[in-house]
Amino acid sequence: ANMIFASIYPLYLNRLEKNGRTKEELNQVIEWFTGFDKDDLQALIKEKVTFRSFFQKAKIHPNTHLIKGVVCGYRIEEIEDEFEVYKQCRRMEKLIDELARGRKMDKILREEKTNLRSG
């Protein structure tokens, strides 16, 4: 929670670029997750905000609860709510992981499934 976002962002970017993805795609994922556009992101990087502050300032997307699975050996759904910053960090890392692995953007940016029944 006290790690500086600006120190981790280049690591995310480097990982994605090695896998043929772009800074724009990384920023798109982060914007979907946090509501921060590229200018907001650059300002936060320049400010050297902590992850705690980063997520406190964010407008977390309502569909982040749909992000499930294992990241860095931790199952996201099992992270206790009291560790909210850690949970948000792992959720965002999961999206970045999926991007690095070549998953399509429309699958990464979660949407609620609606059951449409014709009567």
Regions found by a protein language model. Give the residues of each.
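A charge-rich, low-complexity, intrinsically flexible signal that marks solvent-exposed coils, linkers
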Residues: 1-119
